[in-house]
């Protein structure tokens, strides 16, 4: 009797194998042969799951975005407005080992997207979604009348986006210096600085 293979599960296992290679050996080693070996399948059987290497890499890159989106959908926002906003923003930052692994892979894909149109389209879409989430945080602060006087919303969106992105990059490149605690404290201080002083 032929072995029944769960196609979606196998695609996921292959993508996770690609992640491991990218984290351990770099994007240049993420060949079909190397990924197949890491996944424990033959290179020939890879075509049953992905027709091209580009399709595989696009799927693996999109998997990072899907995992972040799924975590956000499952979040319960039960704290204060500031706590809730911080929780949301931390989903885009590598403040756990799991998210650090995802971020390392994401940045490798982002670098490759400079020369791969399909990856670039996905990267642009995801970065636009992150910017929209950050814009929502700034709008929320203003609508709740928490913001300091004369807050320039457009400028503050860019500043907060730069902070989230910059802290994330530093955490990936220098995890010994940009610890999870420092990252979270820097975000908290920035959010507090956006708000008017309590009377």
Which residues does each PLM region occupy?
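Residues in soluble alpha-helical coiled-coils and helical-bundle/repeat scaffolds
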Residues: 51-55, 76, 80, 97, ...
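Amphipathic alpha-helical packing segments from all-alpha helical-bundle domains
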Residues: 74, 98-107, 117-143, 158, ...
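N-terminal intrinsically disordered/low-complexity leader segments
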Residues: 1-9, 198-199
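Helix-turn-helix
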Residues: 13, 17-55, 59
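Generic hydrophobic, amphipathic alpha-helix propensity
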Residues: 7-18, 35, 60-64, 68, ...
